Design a protein with these regions (language model features):
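An N-terminally biased module of ancient metal coordination in phosphate/nucleic-acid-related enzymes
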Residues: 1-86, 94-98, 160, 167-171, ...
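Extended substrate/RNA-proximal surfaces in nucleic-acid metabolism proteins
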Residues: 49, 54-187
Length: 268
């Protein structure tokens, strides 16, 4: 099993109540060697109920303290998950350059100023229309924002569709997805394999293995592994499935990040 989880949330994220210490202790108990905290920093998130923002100076003080405290047991990296929207390029450029992050995930949590987590997004459209809109917005976002290392959970939108994965496949959206993958590869960006899809009952990881295979075929090499856990019990969720999936898709390595630089590790 891969021993590095590079997508993890704590109480610094508005959708988690777990103290960072609890995540570290569970990761050690599970035998992980490396973890990277990637709490949510979503500028201009729609609505006022859940502002996905945290004080970054406080975050770094806490994470550096934990890194020193547990340095003999686990390697703790300090990252962030930024929420991509096309008008936020300058804001994220300034933000990311202001702190010594090890790793930056760029994720699309908002499509056309709406959060697909809520059913209203799907009310006036079919799942296929909604998914295509999300992929097109993703392409717009990554063209507008340069300050991230990997694109998070590419087909995240499928978690919340009315029929979820019933009518979803890579081939149905291959034109849009291929443009996303080609752009990322051309600009030195990677993708992540996010196991939360299994947790949500989709039966596949994010992105779907068909997309992982296509990314590899197109020459993509940078691929991090993360469970997107918000609770200790979700750390390294279903990680025993990851190496076989990656091998089947043509990969020999996975990727970790340190000081914003990719480090390639052979699959176990």
């Amino acid at each position: 099993m891969i021993k590095a989880d590079f997508h993890m949330h704590t109480s610094f994220s508005s959708d988690s109540e777990t103290m960072p210490e609890k995540m570290v202790e569970e990761a050690i108990r599970m035998g992980l060697k490396t973890i990277c905290f990637t709490d949510h920093q979503d500028f201009d998130f729609p609505g006022e109920e859940t502002p996905f923002l945290f004080d970054t100076a406080t975050y770094f003080r806490k994470m550096k303290k934990l890194r020193e405290m547990y340095r003999d047991k686990i390697d703790i990296r300090i990252g962030v998950e930024i929420g991509l929207q096309p008008h936020l390029g300058n804001a994220y450029k300034e933000y990311v350059s202001s702190y010594p992050f090890d790793f930056v995930i760029g994720s699309v949590h908002v499509v056309n100023q709406m959060d697909p987590y809520y059913g209203e997004f799907f009310e006036d459209k079919t799942d296929s229309e909604a998914y295509r809109q999300a992929f097109l917005e993703t392409l717009t976002d990554i063209r507008a924002i340069k300050d991230f290392d990997v694109l998070g959970h590419i087909d995240y939108i499928v978690r919340y569709g009315k029929e979820k994965e019933k009518y979803y496949s890579y081939t149905k959206f291959s034109d849009e997805i291929d443009e996303i993958l080609k752009y990322l590869i051309a600009h030195g960006k990677g993708i992540e394999l996010n196991t939360a899809g299994f947790k949500y009952g989709l039966g596949f990881c994010h992105p779907h293995p068909e997309i992982l295979k296509r990314y590899c075929e197109l020459g993509g090499e940078i691929i991090t592994i993360g469970a997107d856990g918000h609770k200790p019990e979700h750390i390294a969720y279903d990680f025993e499935k990851v190496a076989p999936i990656l091998r089947e898709c043509g990969f020999k390595y996975y990727t970790e990040f340190k000081e914003r630089k990719p480090v390639f590790k052979q699959l176990p």
